[in-house]
C-alpha cells in the first residue's frame, strides 16, 4: 500500500493556520497556498535521484550533482489545484504542467471529468497531482485513473488537508500511489466538506461563490 505522509514542517503548519482562518482574504489566501505548495514539493522530492556531471566553474573543473531519472509533470485538478502550481514551479522551474478538469455533483458528491491535457511523454514522467483538498477521494481517484489510462506509471498526490475517509479511499483504489498532506483533518462531514478544513478552496482562491 502507498504511504501517507503528513509534512509537519513548522513553516507549513504556520501557513496552513493562516489559510484556515475565515477572515483571510483572497490575495493572502492565494499567495500562501502557493507557498505551501512549494514547501510541500521541496519535502516530497528528497528522494529524487542525482547523477555526477563534469562542469567548469570560474575557478576550474569540478564534478558536481544534478537531477537524474524521470522528469516531472505537475498535474493540478482544476480549478483549485491551480493555486498550488506557481509555488511548485518556483522550486522546479523545468517541470511540465498538465491539467485535469473536474467538477463535483453537489447532490451526489461524485466527480465528473471535463478536460484532460498532458505532455506527450506522460508515461516517461513522474506525475505529482496537486489539489488543496482530499475529501471523499473521488476526484483524486478519477485523476489517478485518467493518468494511468494514458500510460502514467509513477504518480504521487499532494494535498493541503486530507480527510481520513479520502486517504483510505485512495489507498484502497490505488495502493501504488503515495499521498502527501500538510495536515490530516478530523473527519468528512455529511455535506462533503472536511472538518475543520479551510472552506471551499476554489472559491477562496478566486474570490467566487
Swiss-Prot record:
Activity regulation annotation text: Allosterically activated by GTP.
Pfam family, one: UPRTase
Protein family according to the UniProt entry: Belongs to the UPRTase family.
Stored Gene3D superfamilies: 3.40.50.2020
Needed co-factor(s): Mg(2+)
Name of the encoding gene: upp
Cofactor remark: Binds 1 Mg(2+) ion per subunit. The magnesium is bound as Mg-PRPP.
Enzyme class, spelled out: transferase
Keyword line: Allosteric enzyme, Glycosyltransferase, GTP-binding, Magnesium, Nucleotide-binding, Transferase
Protein name: Uracil phosphoribosyltransferase
Annotated organism of origin: Lactobacillus gasseri (strain ATCC 33323 / DSM 20243 / BCRC 14619 / CIP 102991 / JCM 1131 / KCTC 3163 / NCIMB 11718 / NCTC 13722 / AM63)
Amino acid at each position: 500500500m502507498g504511504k501517507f505522509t503528513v509534512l509537519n514542517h513548522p513553516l507549513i503548519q504556520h501557513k496552513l493556520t493562516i489559510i484556515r482562518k475565515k477572515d483571510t482574504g483572497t490575495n493572502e489566501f492565494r499567495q500562501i497556498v502557493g507557498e505551501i505548495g512549494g514547501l510541500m514539493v521541496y519535502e516530497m522530492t528528497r528522494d529524487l535521484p542525482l547523477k555526477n556531471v563534469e562542469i567548469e566553474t570560474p575557478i576550474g573543473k569540478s564534478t558536481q550533482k544534478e537531477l537524474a531519472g524521470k522528469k516531472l509533470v505537475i498535474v493540478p485538478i482544476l480549478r483549485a489545484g491551480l493555486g498550488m502550481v506557481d509555488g511548485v514551479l518556483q522550486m522546479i522551474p523545468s517541470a511540465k504542467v498538465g491539467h485535469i478538469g473536474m467538477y463535483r455533483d453537489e447532490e451526489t458528491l461524485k466527480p465528473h471529468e471535463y478536460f484532460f491535457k498532458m505532455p506527450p511523454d506522460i508515461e516517461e514522467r513522474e506525475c505529482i497531482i496537486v489539489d488543496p483538498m482530499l475529501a471523499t477521494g473521488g476526484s483524486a481517484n478519477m485523476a489517478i485513473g485518467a493518468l494511468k489510462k494514458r500510460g502514467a506509471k509513477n504518480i504521487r498526490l499532494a494535498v493541503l488537508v486530507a480527510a481520513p475517509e479520502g486517504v483510505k479511499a485512495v489507498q484502497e483504489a490505488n495502493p501504488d500511489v503515495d499521498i502527501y498532506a500538510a495536515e490530516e483533518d478530523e473527519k468528512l462531514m455529511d455535506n462533503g466538506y472536511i472538518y475543520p478544513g479551510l472552506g471551499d478552496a476554489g472559491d477562496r482562491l478566486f474570490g467566487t461563490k
